[in-house]
Amino acid sequence: MNTIRNSICLTIITMVLCGFLFPLAITLIGQIFFYQQANGSLITYDNRIVGSKLIGQHWTDTRYFHGRPSAVDYNMNPEKLYKNGVSSGGSNESNGNTELIARVKHHVKFGNSNVTIDAATSSGSGLDPHITVENALKQAPRIADARHISTSRVTDLIQHRMQRGVLTNDYVNVLELNIALDKMKY
C-alpha cells in the first residue's frame, strides 16, 4: 500500500512539475527575455505585419529578390492546409527521382548552369527565409533593371544586410532585403 501511495504522489508531483511549472517558467522566460522571438519574429512595414523573419514567402515580381523554392509552395493558407495537409517540409526525394530532377531543371531555367544551389533546391523545412549572398548578387542586375537603379546600389544593400554564417555561406533574409529595397530613395 505504501508503494502505491508513493507512486501516486510521485506521479502527481511529476505532472505538476512537467505539465504546469516547467511550461509556465519557459513561457515567462520567453515573454520577458525573448519577446520578439517568442511571438514569431514578426516584421512590420507601413504599420502592418508583412511577414516573419523566420518563414519565407513566395516572390514573383521582378522588382524583388526571390527566395528559395519551396517543396510545399509556402503553404501557410489555412484553406490550402486543410486540403493538402502539409504546411512545411522538404520533398524527401532522392537525387535520382525524376520529379526532383524536373523541378530543379525548372528552377534552373532550362539549363542555365550559372545558378546557386539554393536557387534551384528547396530547404528541409520548405520555408527557409534566407538566400545566400551569392544568390542575391546574381539577382541584383534583374532587380536594378526593374527598379531603374544602378546594380551597385543593389549590391551595396545586399552587403549591408548580409549575415555571416558560422559553418555555412553568408546569407540574407529575403523579406528584410525586399523591404529595404522599397525604402530606398530613387
UniProtKB/Swiss-Prot annotation:
GO terms for molecular function: ATP binding; P-type potassium transmembrane transporter activity. It is a single-pass membrane protein. Keywords: ATP-binding, Cell membrane, Ion transport, Membrane, Nucleotide-binding, Potassium, Potassium transport, Transmembrane, Transmembrane helix, Transport. Disulfide bonds: none annotated. InterPro entries: KdpC. The keyword Cell membrane applies. One of its GO terms (cellular component) is plasma membrane. It comes from the Bacteria. The keyword ATP-binding applies. Pfam families: KdpC (PF02669). It is found in: Cell membrane. The chain crosses the membrane at residues 10-30. Belongs to the KdpC family. The system is composed of three essential subunits: KdpA, KdpB and KdpC. Part of the high-affinity ATP-driven potassium transport (or Kdp) system, which catalyzes the hydrolysis of ATP coupled with the electrogenic transport of potassium into the cytoplasm. This subunit acts as a catalytic chaperone that increases the ATP-binding affinity of the ATP-hydrolyzing subunit KdpB by the formation of a transient KdpB/KdpC/ATP ternary complex. This is Potassium-transporting ATPase KdpC subunit. It comes from Staphylococcus aureus (strain bovine RF122 / ET3-1).
